[in-house]
Amino acid sequence: MFLNSLPTNFAALEVGQHLYWQIGNIRLHGQVFLTSWILLGALLVFISVGTKKMENDPKGLQNLLEFLWDYIRDLSRTQIGEKVYRDWMPFIGTLFLFVFVSNWGGALIPWRLIKLPSGELGAPTADINTTIALALLVSLSYFYAGLSNKGWRYFEYYVHPTPIMLPFKILEDFTKPLSLSFRLFGNILADELVVGVLVFLVPLVLPIPVMFLGLFTSAIQALIFATLAAYYIGEAVEEHH
């Protein structure tokens, strides 16, 4: 009976339609660029306003920004180590803030209500291409961290503590970006789908608590992504004895 009572166009509910940009033979997902530019622009304005008049007794936005700075500093120091964490703080902070504002932007802003000639907007991190690119960037970063700090000795990691570990360590280099990208993509996309279905079925009340849960999940996913990135870098620069 419940199934018969559903709207007849329920099957028309879609995950989303891409806004494509064609550059030569390359087709890009334009909605990722548009929403990323909007969110990054808003973040830059937020930071500019918060740091415009720095005070010894921070209040308001300056207080929030200093809290974020301290949090990212402590995260980097804990995961990477005292020796080189300062070199990687800007990278870890940028990752965290981009993923955070992308996730929250998808949870708070009704992108699909913005009408476009074709396609629709959505959270950048709800696109698998974005999360894979971020994960590959993390992989390149910990390779660079290991080689720049240890030189060719970095590859001793692959046979530590025994050469038997070599194939497993190589496999790990592939599973790290896969787990990073699919964890972030899956959680953000699932949240958008759940909210979309509930808005379709019960548009007034039921989606609100789910949206708050989505905000919490989005923040946790940004924290997990930044923490794992810092941990991988710390693992690469760690001296094995």
From Swiss-Prot:
Function field: Key component of the proton channel; it plays a direct role in the translocation of protons across the membrane.
Main localization category: membrane
Gene3D superfamilies: ATP synthase, F0 complex, subunit A (1.20.120.220)
The organism of origin for this protein: Prochlorococcus marinus subsp. pastoris (strain CCMP1986 / NIES-2087 / MED4)
Cell compartments where the protein resides: Cellular thylakoid membrane
Family: Belongs to the ATPase A chain family.
Molecular function, one GO term: proton-transporting ATP synthase activity, rotational mechanism
Subunit record text: F-type ATPases have 2 components, CF(1) - the catalytic core - and CF(0) - the membrane proton channel. CF(1) has five subunits: alpha(3), beta(3), gamma(1), delta(1), epsilon(1). CF(0) has four main subunits: a, b, b' and c.
Name of the protein: ATP synthase subunit a
Gene name tied to this protein: atpB
TM region(s), chain numbering: 30-50, 91-111, 128-148, 193-213, 214-234
Bilayer topology: Multi-pass membrane protein
Keywords tagged on the record: ATP synthesis, CF(0), Hydrogen ion transport, Ion transport, Membrane, Thylakoid, Transmembrane, Transmembrane helix, Transport
Gene Ontology CC: plasma membrane-derived thylakoid membrane; proton-transporting ATP synthase complex
Pfam families assigned to the protein according to its UniProt record, in alphabetical order: ATP-synt_A
Cited HAMAP family: ATP_synth_a_bact
